[in-house]
Amino acid sequence: MDRLASTSALNLARSLYEAGIRDEPVLKAVANTPRERFLDAALGHKAYENTALPIGQGQTISQPYIVARMTEILLQCQPQKVLEIGTGSGYQAAILAQLVPQLCTVERIKSLQIQARQRLKKLDLHNIAFKYGDGWQGWPSKGPYDAIMVTAAAASVPNALTEQLTDGGVLVIPVGEASQQLLKVTRKGNQYVSEAIEIVRFVPLINGELA
């Protein structure tokens, strides 16, 4: 990361601290990640603003605050293996891969997946497994997972995902249509405890449609 980007990423991490993010490893990962590499060059000047930005195909790179917030919630269960639904630009995966030993990520849009793989390889992040497929179904053959993060809003919590959690595992997912709620769902045996975190806005999680 060049000096200007490094300074900008550090300033972004500081602004997230001021916004309420307190997990030091998360803030360090944000400070170490060049967000402009996950955007088209035309949007590079906005890379370190705390806002969501378009990445093509009707998708977005999430607001840095939400990336950090979802990550610190997920890390509360100290996961060893994590599944991400919605690779998108790869930015969220870049943050997670610095914080967990093993990351699996699923993307339904082939062009986005190819770009994300290239970006993450250039950042020397090699603890990531990629799948082109339907995020609603997760990635059963790689499971179970200690934690699952969904980066698009589902109309309801997908049973296929909760079933891929370990006992004590956590699903972090935005749920809803016009009004969306970020949920933390914890598996306790064959039961699931849901906790509402905050109001959010995400692109929809598409069921069964690849692009």
Curated annotation (Swiss-Prot):
Gene Ontology terms: biological process: methylation; protein modification process; protein repair
GO MF: protein-L-isoaspartate (D-aspartate) O-methyltransferase activity
Record bears the keyword Transferase: yes
Keyword Disulfide bond: no
Alphabetized Pfam families for the sequence: PCMT
Record CDD domains: AdoMet_MTases
Domain of life of the organism encoding this protein: Bacteria
InterPro entries: PCMT (IPR000682), SAM-dependent_MTases_sf (IPR029063)
Enzyme class: transferase
GO cellular component, one term: cytoplasm
EC number: 2.1.1.77
Active site annotation, chain numbering: S62
Entries under PANTHER family matching the protein: PROTEIN-L-ISOASPARTATE O-METHYLTRANSFERASE (PTHR11579), PROTEIN-L-ISOASPARTATE(D-ASPARTATE) O-METHYLTRANSFERASE (PTHR11579:SF0)
Purpose: Catalyzes the methyl esterification of L-isoaspartyl residues in peptides and proteins that result from spontaneous decomposition of normal L-aspartyl and L-asparaginyl residues. It plays a role in the repair and/or degradation of damaged proteins.
Similarity-based family: Belongs to the methyltransferase superfamily. L-isoaspartyl/D-aspartyl protein methyltransferase family.
Protein name (record): Protein-L-isoaspartate O-methyltransferase
Gene, per the UniProt record: pcm
